[in-house]
Amino acid sequence: MDIADQTFVKKVNQKLLLKEILKNSPISRAKLSEMTGLNKSTVSSQVNTLMKENLVFEIGQGQSSGGRRPVMLVFNKKAGYSIGIDVGVDYISGILTDLEGTIILDQHHHLESNSPEITKDILIDMIHHFITRMPQSPYGLIGIGICVPGLIDKNQKIVFTPNSNWRDIDLKSFIQEKFNVPVFIENEANAGAYGEKVFGAAKNHNNIIYASISTGIGIGVIINNHLYRGVSGFSGEMGHMTIDFNGPKCSCGNRGCWELYASEKALLKSLQTKEKKVSYQDIIDLAHLNDIGTLNALQNFGFYLGIGLTNILNTFNPQAIILRNSIIESHPMVLNSIRSEVSSRVYPQLGNSYELLPSSLGKNAPALGMSSIVIEHFLDIVKM
């Protein structure tokens, strides 16, 4: 075996060992050898390398099953820190996490204007806020992940955001030049799907759909544990599938799009009158007070969500659909309405093969997904 091949094998072994340490900390070298099939000298050598790289450390002795007590190893989650940011239509939410995704700091801004220039200024301030308060660590800031609700191409350039009207914006290069760390740009629903897969309700599923229901509707698709992005990176824009061929005009240029009937924007519109402007918080409060008009609107909201979700279930046949929406998460009647509509329409052979679940990470799902993408890239670079 030549030197290049030996180096490659060592790196593959390091990756395998770190994966097991991440999943099973604390763990002994002997157990690592047993679980990976690598011999004890290889395990010892590669663990020493990981320790020199500050990714693994010893925490003392574990229980013995006979003979000497083993020295236990754990992953060093404080070796570096990651920033994940969710840029919505009218907000920016950011988090600083350690390498296991534990949130160390968070910050939220309401956007009075969603122009790219104003948004960039707030992003820079937020990132500076996290960096100046970040704990000391061997690797410092390992990267920044930012998601937006819109079309992201294969080069991570923002092509179009229907509800903010951003077009052809290279946010990745702009942030990378400012902070000189790896930067990742992703669609918001894809980021949310990844967050739920790594940390949340979809942890134990291989095939899931994540539906982000806010001003618009975005869908994140995970197939066999991998994000599905499509040929151009534009998959998941199912908020713009037609459910009424002769319906009203949408901002995307189509007519009768699903999100015109089943988004937060549509819900607010259905309750507003010339005399009364209704806020999202008003809807939550009125629903808790059992206001009849509000409850009827929420029932209708669930009805239209159920129609679109039925199409998605029949198309993808996932194990679960994770629903991210504050009202769905706080009002069981909306989820019940969705489930009722779906069960009455879905392909009968699907039976009970799927689950409809509220998000377990809530508003943090997209930012956690972005932080996870940054962390995975960092660990690949360090090890490979």
UniProtKB/Swiss-Prot annotation:
Residues 29-48 bind DNA. It comes from the Bacteria. The keyword Repressor applies. SUPFAM superfamilies: Actin-like ATPase domain (SSF53067), Winged helix' DNA-binding domain (SSF46785). The keyword S-adenosyl-L-methionine does not apply. One of its GO terms (molecular function) is DNA binding. Disulfide bonds: none annotated. InterPro entries: ATPase_NBD, ROK, ROK_cs, WH-like_DNA-bd_sf, WH_DNA-bd_sf. Keywords: Carbohydrate metabolism, DNA-binding, Repressor, Transcription, Transcription regulation, Xylose metabolism. It holds the Pfam family ROK. GO terms for biological process: D-xylose metabolic process. Transcriptional repressor of xylose-utilizing enzymes. Belongs to the ROK (NagC/XylR) family. This is Xylose repressor. The gene is xylR.
